[in-house]
């Protein structure tokens, strides 16, 4: 009986490890949760001053929402990613536990202070994808939307 369990366990552990391994991503994006906004950093790209591209993303309030905008889901700075490209998200938190949730892309990853978690994604088509912090992290927890916009590789590079 123990031999059967061992024969099943070792290949299973190897498969679990390989499933979670990100194979040579083209882009890495650091997502850091704060009370109550997200910070992003494209570590593979540099701006004109040769610094990493980084920005904060806050929810757009109802008074600033444009016509047709989604209440409680729209942000001032979206994450822009190319379609059909392997992307690795490195997720962490600065203060309390958060959770980076993007159901349409199959992402839900907890963000812990002092710990880095990585998930990979391949976006198959252009579009705008909405998600939110999925961990109750304080009084303004509902004010932490996540918006990822997927564009063609040509648009992304310009």
PLM regions: where:
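Non-transmembrane, membrane-proximal soluble domains of secreted or membrane proteins
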Residues: 1-158
